[in-house]
A protein has these predicted regions:
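Class I SAM-dependent methyltransferase SAM/SAH-binding core
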Residues: 61-104
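A short acidic, Gly/Pro-enriched loop at the edge of an enzyme's catalytic core
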Residues: 107-115
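A short glycine-rich, Lys/Arg-flanked "PGG" loop and its adjoining helix->strand segment in the class I
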Residues: 133-145
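SAM-dependent methyltransferase
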Residues: 150-222
Length: 256
């Protein structure tokens, strides 16, 4: 396992119990994200089975299942997969989850899915152009003819120019107790950085700080779109947030 892959697996393993805390209201965010993604997909009875290849604790998978889509989810983090399974059970949603690597999708059948998604800036965890191309090739192989790909990524153009070293903190309140979420970026080279994510919670006994570290490679939405084209996907375009209502730009593509 490559060092960056191992680091990111540990990043998400350690975050599994806390991931929902980066949202003001995780359930409300799930509903918004699910509605935005559904606008880019055919209705459930037409699209068939959807595969979420970076499902994490289930944010998008559960949201789509809740509005009638048939969804499978996979992720490199076994700990997050376990939580996604618990969340699906607690919500009585029929949504299956398993461990897999988006670069190979070894557990995904060829030509099985009507759509494949990878949201929340998942692809920039991949450490090379070859890894991104492999991911799109695995997606294409797993799609039905005409199947859709949706990938959301951070709009890195401004960050690459200005070399930001932190993101502004966001402040939430949980029944009167405060919560602060912020990021520090340690740049390794002109593209790669280690993100330090801090979740600071106020409790009756004081403040508790949770720290998680992962690695990203800043790849712009336009670059991601070119990789999708190179991998043989068609009708590739980048949709800005203003067009979709999703919080990140979305790259949309189709299998031949």
């Amino acid at each position: 396992m490559a060092l960056s892959t191992q680091m990111n697996e540990q990043f998400y393993d350690s975050m599994a119990d806390y991931y929902h805390l980066i949202f003001e209201d995780w359930d409300a965010s799930m509903r918004r994200q699910g509605a935005a993604i559904a606008k880019l997909l055919p209705p459930p009875e037409e699209v068939g089975l959807i595969l979420d290849v970076a499902c994490g604790i289930g944010t998008q998978s559960l949201a789509l299942a809740a509005i009638g889509y048939s969804v499978e989810g996979s992720d490199i983090s076994a700990v997050e997969i376990a939580r996604a399974q618990r969340e699906a059970a607690s919500r009585r949603l029929k949504c299956s989850f398993r461990v897999d690597d988006m670069r190979t999708l070894k557990t995904a059948s060829v030509g099985r899915y009507g759509a494949i998604i990878a949201m929340d800036n998942a692809l920039p965890h991949l450490d090379s152009d070859e890894d991104i191309l492999s991911t799109f090739a695995a997606m294409r192989s797993s799609l039905l003819p005409g199947g859709k790909v949706l990938v959301s990524v951070r709009d890195y153009a401004r960050h690459l120019q200005e070399r930001h070293t932190c993101m502004p903190p966001v402040f939430y309140s949980d029944n009167g107790q405060r919560r602060i979420v912020f990021q520090v970026w340690d740049w390794i080279d002109e593209r790669r950085y280690v993100v330090h994510l801090y979740v600071t919670q106020e409790t009756v006994d004081g403040w508790t700080v949770h720290h998680f570290a992962g690695k990203y490679r800043a790849v712009t939405p336009e670059e991601i779109a070119r990789f999708a084209n190179q991998a043989g996907l068609q009708e590739v375009c980048v949709l800005p947030s203003s067009n979709t209502g999703f919080y990140q730009p979305i790259i949309v593509a189709e299998a031949a």
